[in-house]
Curated annotation (Swiss-Prot):
It is an enzyme of class 2 (transferase). The keyword Membrane applies. The gene is mtgA. Pfam families: Transgly. Keywords: Cell inner membrane, Cell membrane, Cell shape, Cell wall biogenesis/degradation, Glycosyltransferase, Membrane, Peptidoglycan synthesis, Transferase, Transmembrane, Transmembrane helix. It catalyses: [GlcNAc-(1->4)-Mur2Ac(oyl-L-Ala-gamma-D-Glu-L-Lys-D-Ala-D-Ala)](n)-di-trans,octa-cis-undecaprenyl diphosphate + beta-D-GlcNAc-(1->4)-Mur2Ac(oyl-L-Ala-gamma-D-Glu-L-Lys-D-Ala-D-Ala)-di-trans,octa-cis-undecaprenyl diphosphate = [GlcNAc-(1->4)-Mur2Ac(oyl-L-Ala-gamma-D-Glu-L-Lys-D-Ala-D-Ala)](n+1)-di-trans,octa-cis-undecaprenyl diphosphate + di-trans,octa-cis-undecaprenyl diphosphate + H(+). This is Biosynthetic peptidoglycan transglycosylase. It is a single-pass membrane protein. It comes from Xanthomonas campestris pv. campestris (strain ATCC 33913 / DSM 3586 / NCPPB 528 / LMG 568 / P 25). The keyword Transmembrane applies. Disulfide bonds: none annotated. PANTHER family: BIOSYNTHETIC PEPTIDOGLYCAN TRANSGLYCOSYLASE, MONOFUNCTIONAL BIOSYNTHETIC PEPTIDOGLYCAN TRANSGLYCOSYLASE. Pathway: Cell wall biogenesis; peptidoglycan biosynthesis. Peptidoglycan polymerase that catalyzes glycan chain elongation from lipid-linked precursors. The lineage of its organism: Bacteria, Pseudomonadati, Pseudomonadota, Gammaproteobacteria, Lysobacterales.
Length: 246
């Protein structure tokens, strides 16, 4: 009897270890399943808010920015002036219609540029930016980068390109606390996003790298130069027709 009790005690640790191992093995599968369901849900559901908006709100609250307010209103892609999507593609990701989430040529160019000691340049595609802004937190850790790649693969797999672009122009930050085309059009020019002009659209695209530093409503010299360049690029790409599904 005493021996049986000793055997039971010796058996418990291996059983606990096996249970722990099962959880360790199951956790990645559970996360993968949950993330797939997330992405599938947002293929048809328009999110009322994104992680980047939550992050900015918490930042403002933590720093005591009493006057901060968040502006966002969803608009379907067909309710936004066609000049805006082509402007952001011309500015941010000209291979968007043809790549599968990652622009390897742009990544190589950015790596060479950064290796020469220039100001650090990114090579994130629109798909990667959607993954980051909708599902993840801000940061540069390898964990976040890995999750960004995973979500990028999922949205490219499960969402049509038009949905990715629609999500992008609705969650992108165009000014401090101003997210999406509709909020930007209202705050800057007092109009609906459907009435944005090509110049206004190009201005919004021009401030995307640093929307808290540059002002689309009162553009300085840099934004004006960038706006003109974006308009030229958009014309060279073929205008809004460049983004039409084949």
């Amino acid at each position: 009897m005493g021996t049986d009790g000793l055997d039971d005690k010796q058996a418990r640790p291996p059983r606990r270890a096996r249970r722990s191992l099962r959880w360790v093995l199951a956790a990645p599968l559970l996360f993968a399943a949950a993330s797939v369901l997330q992405v599938l849900a947002l293929r048809i559901i328009d999110p009322p808010i994104s992680t980047v908006m939550v992050g900015r709100y918490l930042e403002a609250w933590g720093e005591g920015e009493a006057g901060f307010s968040l502006h966002h209103q969803w608009r379907d892609l067909d309710e936004i002036a066609p000049s805006l999507p082509i402007s952001v593609v011309a500015a941010e990701d000209q291979q968007f219609p043809s790549h599968h989430g990652f622009d390897l040529q742009a990544i190589e160019k950015a790596r060479d540029y950064n290796a020469r000691g220039g100001r650090v340049r990114g090579a994130s595609t629109i798909s990667q930016q959607v993954a980051k802004n909708v599902f993840l937190w801000q940061g540069r850790s390898w964990v976040r980068k890995g999750l960004e790649a995973w979500y990028t693969l999922l949205i490219e797999l499960f969402w049509p390109k038009q949905r990715i672009l629609e999500m992008y122009v609705n969650v992108a930050e165009f000014g401090d606390g101003i997210y999406g085309a509709q909020a930007a059009a209202r705050q800057f020019w007092g109009k609906d996003a459907s009435r944005l002009t090509p110049t206004e659209s190009a201005r919004l695209a021009a401030v995307l790298p640093s929307p808290r530093r540059y002002d689309a409503r009162r553009p300085g010299a840099y934004v004006q130069r960038r706006t003109a360049w974006i308009q030229r690029q958009a014309r060279q790409l073929g205008g809004p027709g460049y983004l039409q599904a084949p």
